[in-house]
Amino acid sequence: MKRSTANAPKLSPKHESESDPKKVKLEEEAKPTVNQAPTGREIVENYLKGDVTAAVLYRKICNALETFEQWESEAPKIQLLDQFLNIADAMEARTETLVKRLLSLRWDKIPGSVIERFRNFLCELAIRHLCFTEEVYSAVVERLVPQISVTEETGVVTLILTEKVQNEHFEMAHHIISSVLRCFPLSARALLKCVKRVMPHFTRPSVTVAGYMRNLILMQKYIPASISKDVWEAVFERLAKDDTHNWKCEQNEEMSKSPRLFALNDDILIEEVVEGNTNDSEDVTPEQLEQRKGEQMIQYLDSVCTDVITFIRSSVDSEIDEENGNERTKLNDKWLRNFKITGDKVLPKEKLFDTFLECLESTMLNATHVQYVSFIWLYFCSLSQEYEKKMLEHLWQVTIRMPRAPADARKSQGAASYLAAFLARAKYVKKSTAFTWLEEVYIWLRHYVDQFGSGSSQILPGLQRHGTFYSVSQAFFLVFAFRYKEFVKNKDMLETIRRWGVGRVVHSPLEPLKYVSKPVARCFSAITRSLQLVYCNHIIPIEEVQRPFDDMFPFDCYHLKESSKFMTPLMRKFSPLAEDMSTLTKALCWNAATADKSEKSAEAVSSSEGLDFLDEDDAMMMGGSSGYRERTFSCGQSSLINYSATPGLQTFNV
């Protein structure tokens, strides 16, 4: 009889596995063992855990990245980068060495197949880890400076990368910065810090500064409004310093009779001069090397001023673009139109002028010897009467503001100089506007004299505490000299001027004519004597006296070739009445002769040069005279009407 097995217990899968452990073990041992290399994530994670083997590999990788640029084959580069471009989340402060090695890689040495992943890695790294945000910004902003090489013997500057590759790197850097700002808006201040730190040194070639400045202008397309003003200030501070340095170099060359020529006349383009000098690269003297640097500086200032004007034009209303459509064809704005990156919370277009106005106060009013950069504001105000009105009102408020520190007093004096420059030089400032402001200035001067100039026994003229008064006085004299021809043609204006009693200020114990610019004083004296307003020539000292203020004359000359086509139509030449021409010529010729004691400079002064002060219609009245003297802008020559001898009254021929 067979035993039934229906009720026999069945083994579960667990019991089955336990019943044959040897079989499982033999199957595992039968598989061949392969030593797989650890991935980049595993190396980093184990290194952070303190694993010794991982620490050794970590150091080897960091050392290998130092020689990354020397590798000829792309395969090992791709293999190495593949290990780390996807593990930005695994990085932290203890992996700083590895991160710095990756950030320092030259972008042109990274294979094109992984360059996009490398870009995304930098974005993710800056967004995820606060400790690396500034490091990423610094490395990326450095890529906004063009890569160049300089031959020390000849000073010839050559680009390391092609224009196409360099522009690709610029675009990649802007993409990274804009992406990080969009995801991490609070990092804007860290970006600003890097922008200021990466600014090329003054000893670097001008082409690097020009390229960096253009990228900072493009950055305005996407950076938040909270740092937009600060970036513009960084741009204008550097431009003002370079402009001042260029002015000092030109003045030193005039005094030392250096053979260096900048060749800034109409017939010779700056670009042609530079190319002509760089051909003879075998034997370059120190003088030629210095000349080449000066020409590069002029090109750089011209290029950046043109770029800023281009940005301003792209930001104004379309109505202005339509009115000046022909002018836009002359403007190379392709670099700006092709830039498509935008950002959130950028500076509104209508706020751009207010930002520039603040930058003028913070960077330009204390910059004494700036020649060219200040013309940017002259151009900006020409686009709208509202801009012109805002500018004049703001400058006047800064002028009469109560100073709390010596720097505030200098700023007030600078504001008075700019106010005078706008009223005297800008063609778009109407006669009525200039007269209204001139009357406002005179009323302030009269009140100042009544308050501080009464009681001659207690007044010591020429003190620095009265510096603002003397700067405003010079502004009054300058504007009157430039615009009196228009005022006297209006009987009501002329009668109003006679009622002012200008002698009340001129003959006050503060003696303003004694402490202002001598050419301005002589010109004002000759004009007022001709109009029988006041006789004051005897007040002007023969010898130069120390001025209690830092005088400046914005918009006095403009020799930058490319951007001059936007500036020269806005400028007003000094144009007296025809009957006053001979008197003014004698006064200014006498001043030029005494300013330069040399016999050669005295012989250069001729009566025909006085015609530089005339417009074309006045020149016709002089009986067929040629009217204009062809100017040569050489630093080794001196002329009757030059910036150093007769500031404020320089003719405007380019």
Curated annotation (Swiss-Prot):
<comment type="similarity">
    <text>Belongs to the RRN3 family.</text>
</comment>
<comment type="function">
    <text>Required for efficient transcription initiation by RNA polymerase I (Pol I).</text>
</comment>
<dbReference type="GO" id="GO:0001042">
    <property type="term" value="F:RNA polymerase I core binding"/>
</dbReference>
<dbReference type="Pfam" id="PF05327">
    <property type="entry name" value="RRN3"/>
</dbReference>
<feature type="compositionally biased region" description="Basic and acidic residues">
    <location>
        <begin position="13"/>
        <end position="31"/>
    </location>
</feature>
<feature type="region of interest" description="Disordered">
    <location>
        <begin position="1"/>
        <end position="37"/>
    </location>
</feature>
<dbReference type="GO" id="GO:0005730">
    <property type="term" value="C:nucleolus"/>
</dbReference>
<dbReference type="GO" id="GO:0006361">
    <property type="term" value="P:transcription initiation at RNA polymerase I promoter"/>
</dbReference>
<keyword id="KW-0539">Nucleus</keyword>
<protein>
    <recommendedName>
        <fullName>RNA polymerase I-specific transcription initiation factor tif-1A</fullName>
    </recommendedName>
</protein>
<dbReference type="InterPro" id="IPR007991">
    <property type="entry name" value="RNA_pol_I_trans_ini_fac_RRN3"/>
</dbReference>
<keyword id="KW-0805">Transcription regulation</keyword>
<dbReference type="GO" id="GO:0005634">
    <property type="term" value="C:nucleus"/>
</dbReference>
<dbReference type="GO" id="GO:0001181">
    <property type="term" value="F:RNA polymerase I general transcription initiation factor activity"/>
</dbReference>
<keyword id="KW-0804">Transcription</keyword>
